[in-house]
C-alpha cells in the first residue's frame, strides 16, 4: 500500500541527520519519488482516483488509524498529531483535485462525442454538389423554349444543343476516375463543380456569340459533371465505413433527384420575372459559393484532415482503405474480374430504362395520357421526388441488414434485384391501365423501386475495389451514359415504327438481363486491392 508524505514535515528518527526540505513525494515504504511539485501531485491524483495505489477517502476511521500506524512503524512520522492531520489534508486535496481533473476530461470527451461527425459533413457537401449538378443540367430543358424563340432555332438545332452536354460528359467518366484515384477526390470534385458552374454562367454569352460557342460551352459543362461522379465515389470510399455506405450514397444521389425538382421548379419563375439568362447566372453563382466551402473544409481522406477526432478517424480507417492515392491503375486485373463486368453490364441495363423514362416521360404524358404541358411538367416532378425518398429508405434498409450480420454480397443482390424487377413489373402494368392517375402512379412506383439501385450496383464499386472506386464508377457509368444516349435515340425509332408497349418491352427485357447477370456474377467482397 502506498502512502504519500511531504518531506517538509519534521518526521526524523531521533539521532538521524535532519531531512532536507523537498517538495518531492516519496513512498514511505522505500519507493522512488515520482515527481516534483504539481507534476507529482497530478500523477498521484490519477492513481488515487483509479484506486490502484490509494484507497478512497470514504474509508472507515479504523482504516485511517491502521494506515497511520503503518506509516509510523515505517519511520514515516512520529506521534505528532499535526503531521497526521497534514497528511490527511494532502490526501483529501489529491482526491478532490483528481475528481475535478476527471470531470474536465469527461466533459472534453462528451464535447468530442457530441461533435457532428466529419464524415457526414463530407457526405452533405457531396449531396449539395450533386444538387447543383442536376439543377444546372435541367435548366436548359426549360430555358431552351424562350431561347429557341429568340434565336430562331429549329427542332434539329435544339436536339444538337441538348446532346452537346453528353459529348463532354461521356468522354470524362473514365478520365475523371483515373484522376480522382491518383490525385485525390477533393481536387477533382472541386474542379468539376467550379468548371461546370463557370460554363453555366457563360451560357448566355455563348448563345449570343453563336451556335458553335454554345455547343462548346455545353460540352465543357459536361466535362465538369463527367468527372464529378467518379470523384465523389473516390471520396466516399475513403470517408465512409462500410456500415454506412448505402445510406451515404443514397443521400448523395438523392441530391441529384432533388436538384432536378429544384431546377424544374425555379427555372420558370426566374425566366418569367428576370428573363432566361437569369437562370444560368443564378445557378452558376451557387457553385462558386459551394467551392469556397469545399476548398476550406474538405479533405480527400480522413488521414489528411487535422480537425477530425481520433475516435472518428479510427472508426473510418478500420472499415475503409483510407490510404494515399494510387500511383498506377491495374487495368488488366480490373478487366479480368467477372464482378467488374457485372457492374458494367448491369449499369447499362439499368440506365437504358431509367433514361428513357426520364427523357420521354413528358411526351408519354402528353400523347398517351392526354395531359397538357403544364400537367405534364407537374407530374414529371413526381418520379424525382419518389426516387429521392426511396433511395434514402433503401439505403437505410441495406445498412441495417449489413449491421445485423447479412453479408454485403447478399444485401447488394437483394437491393439491385428490387432496382431491376420493380421497374420491370410496373412497366408491364402500363399496357393494362386506362386511368391516367393509375398510369402516373405506376410511373412513380417504377422510379421509386429503381432508386433501390443506389444501395445495389451504385454502392458496389466501393465494395469490390475501394482504392479504385473512381475508375470502377467511370467504367460502369460510361456504359450507363451510352445506354442513355442509344436508348433515347432508339425510343424515337421504335415509336416511329411501333408503340409505347414496344418501348417498355425492350426496357423490361434489359431489366431481366441485368437481374440475371447481377445475381450470377456480382459480389460484395473486395477483389481488387
From Swiss-Prot:
Annotated compartments: Plastid, Chloroplast membrane
In which residue ranges is the amino acid composition biased (Basic and acidic residues)?
67-76
User: CDD domains from the xrefs?
Assistant: MFS_SLC17A9_like
Any Pfam family hit: MFS_1
Enumerate the InterPro entries for this protein: MFS, MFS_dom, MFS_Na/Anion_cotransporter, MFS_trans_sf, SLC17A9-like
Keywords from the named record = Chloroplast, Ion transport, Membrane, Plastid, Transit peptide, Transmembrane, Transmembrane helix, Transport
Q: Per the record, which residues fall in region Disordered? A: 13-39, 52-78
- Stretches of Gly residues bias are at 28-39
What protein am I looking at?
Answer: Probable anion transporter 1, chloroplastic
**Gene that this sequence comes from:** PHT4;1
Amino acid at each position: 500500500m502506498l502512502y504519500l508524505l511531504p518531506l517538509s514535515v519534521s518526521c526524523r528518527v531521533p539521532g538521524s541527520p535532519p531531512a532536507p526540505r523537498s517538495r518531492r513525494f516519496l513512498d514511505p515504504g522505500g519507493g522512488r519519488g515520482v515527481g516534483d511539485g504539481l507534476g507529482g501531485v497530478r500523477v498521484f491524483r490519477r492513481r488515487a482516483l483509479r484506486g490502484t495505489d490509494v484507497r478512497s477517502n470514504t474509508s472507515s476511521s479504523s482504516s485511517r488509524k491502521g494506515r497511520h500506524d503503518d506509516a509510523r512503524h515505517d519511520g514515516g512520522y512520529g506521534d505528532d498529531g499535526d503531521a497526521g492531520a497534514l497528511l490527511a489534508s494532502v490526501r483529501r486535496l489529491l482526491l478532490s483535485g483528481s475528481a475535478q481533473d476527471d470531470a474536465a476530461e469527461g466533459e472534453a470527451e462528451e464535447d468530442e462525442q457530441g461533435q457532428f461527425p466529419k464524415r457526414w459533413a463530407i457526405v452533405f457537401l457531396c449531396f449539395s454538389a450533386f444538387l447543383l449538378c442536376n439543377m444546372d443540367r435541367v435548366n436548359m430543358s426549360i430555358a431552351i423554349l424562350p431561347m429557341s424563340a429568340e434565336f430562331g432555332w429549329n427542332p434539329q438545332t435544339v436536339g444538337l444543343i441538348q446532346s452537346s452536354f453528353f459529348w463532354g460528359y461521356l468522354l470524362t467518366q473514365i478520365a475523371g476516375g483515373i484522376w480522382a484515384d491518383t490525385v485525390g477526390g477533393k481536387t477533382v470534385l472541386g474542379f468539376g463543380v467550379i468548371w461546370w458552374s463557370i460554363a453555366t454562367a457563360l451560357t448566355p454569352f455563348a448563345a449570343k456569340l453563336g451556335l458553335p460557342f454554345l455547343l462548346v460551352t455545353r460540352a465543357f459543362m459536361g466535362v465538369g459533371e463527367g468527372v464529378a461522379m467518379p470523384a465523389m465515389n473516390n471520396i466516399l470510399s475513403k470517408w465512409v465505413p462500410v456500415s454506412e455506405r448505402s445510406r451515404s450514397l443514397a443521400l448523395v444521389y438523392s441530391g441529384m433527384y432533388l436538384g432536378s425538382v429544384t431546377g424544374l421548379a425555379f427555372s420558370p419563375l426566374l425566366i418569367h420575372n428576370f428573363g432566361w439568362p437569369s437562370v444560368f447566372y443564378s445557378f452558376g453563382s451557387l457553385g462558386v459559393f459551394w467551392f469556397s466551402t469545399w476548398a476550406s473544409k474538405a479533405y480527400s481522406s480522413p488521414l489528411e484532415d487535422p480537425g477530425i477526432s481520433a475516435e472518428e478517424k479510427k472508426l473510418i480507417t478500420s472499415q475503409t482503405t483510407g490510404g494515399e492515392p494510387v500511383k498506377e491503375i491495374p487495368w488488366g486485373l480490373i478487366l479480368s474480374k467477372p464482378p467488374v463486368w457485372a457492374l458494367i453490364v448491369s449499369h447499362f441495363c439499368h440506365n437504358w430504362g431509367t433514361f428513357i423514362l426520364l427523357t420521354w416521360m413528358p411526351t408519354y404524358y402528353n400523347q398517351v395520357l392526354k395531359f397538357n404541358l403544364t400537367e405534364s411538367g407537374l407530374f414529371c416532378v413526381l418520379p424525382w421526388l419518389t426516387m429521392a425518398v426511396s433511395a434514402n429508405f433503401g439505403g437505410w434498409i441495406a445498412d441495417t441488414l449489413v449491421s445485423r450480420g447479412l453479408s454485403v454480397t447478399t444485401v447488394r443482390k437483394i437491393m439491385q434485384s428490387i432496382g431491376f424487377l420493380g421497374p420491370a413489373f410496373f412497366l408491364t402494368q402500363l399496357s393494362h391501365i386506362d386511368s391516367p392517375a393509375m398510369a402516373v402512379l405506376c410511373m412513380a412506383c417504377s422510379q421509386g423501386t429503381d432508386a433501390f439501385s443506389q444501395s445495389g450496383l451504385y454502392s458496389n464499386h466501393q465494395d469490390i475495389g475501394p482504392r479504385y472506386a473512381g475508375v470502377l464508377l467511370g467504367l460502369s457509368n460510361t456504359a450507363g451514359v451510352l445506354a442513355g444516349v442509344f436508348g433515347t435515340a432508339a425510343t424515337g425509332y421504335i415509336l416511329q415504327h411501333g408503340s409505347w408497349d414496344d418501348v417498355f418491352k425492350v426496357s423490361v427485357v434489359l431489366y431481366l438481363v441485368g437481374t440475371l447477370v447481377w445475381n450470377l456474377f456480382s459480389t460484395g467482397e473486395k477483389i481488387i486491392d
